[in-house]
Amino acid sequence: MLARMDYNVPLSPEGAVTDPIRVDSTLPTLDHLREAGARIILVSHLGRPKGSPEPRYSLAPVARLLAQRLDADVPLLTDPPGSDALTERVEAMEDGDVVLLENIRFLPGETENDPDLGEALGRLGEVFLGDAFGAAHRAHASNVGAARAIRDRGGPAVAGLLMERELRFLREAVRDPARPFVAVLGGAKISGKIDVIEALLPQVDRLIVGGAMANTFFRALGLSTGASLVEEDRVAMAGELLERAGEKLLLPVDCVVATTLDAAADSRTVSRDGVGEGERIGDIGATSQELFSREVRGARTCLWNGPMGVFELAPFAEGTFAVARALAEATDAGAISVVGGGDSAAAAVAADVAERLTHISTGGGASLELLAGASLPGVDVLDQLGDEGGNE
């Protein structure tokens, strides 16, 4: 079985996996397959190598972590798909064996969905399993190309347990949510989330906007944002969204500002119309934290994507952590909470509430695409997907 995973994990300078969530999230799939006697060839990328080997992007640390988690040998195979050496190694596998191919982006043609590479990968397995939700919004050789190659030979292309879980929670969050349905959007730029806002506005009972993307909305309201990041070419769009959303869209009423955004910043809290000329907005203020937290605690379904500030820096972390704690409290009270991957997932871990939330997505970009109503090539190519059916 050829299994496309998303092991694009952060590594320390010493080469250790610093956040194992993407590896650990695939363990239920791997345990299930091994118990069934499958011979599993794992495929993944890590980082953005340019079609040739770069040691800093090797999947060797992932192979070591998988071996620890599975309590089994997980060799890293460096021979390329289509080579006699790799074919012979795969043919020698026994039931329950797991191997990991070296970073698929070390090969030219992966990101271009090269048909020859897809065919070479497809010849390694009789079944394709897609469990890389984090890469599902890309049409690459290792997901779309390999799946099609196996399907063309009459083999199935199926979703893994992680893929099914991701799609179930993200689709249900929008399609038939328990109400009140509250969405919290943050992060740096409105441009990457306009389609998500457009898709969510008719569905949500309340849309909360924080983080640096709120600055562009402030500018649309005619407020000074000092030296803060603002997408000038999106101010008019922000104004249109504010007009359409009315009272449904909630912005911060106060901000934590400083002249520099660093760990030693001398910060102060001001109302949103009190940002000084040389000041930068780094977080939402205490009043906004309570306002947002009250909305989140009252939700029955809550979707969160994007931090409220520069949470990696202590002077600007409390807004994000306040939202994370409120989300955990809502979940404890029976709400469904879905965190849309990326920085918000890291923030949930940093706030020590990750275990209390319903679902933390492993795919930042893919989750946004799905919430915006876009098709995901890595999902569309699968012909067995729980009760959703195939898309081809």
List each model region and its residues.
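Active-site loop-to-helix "anion-binding N-cap" substructures in soluble metabolic enzymes
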Residues: M1-E392
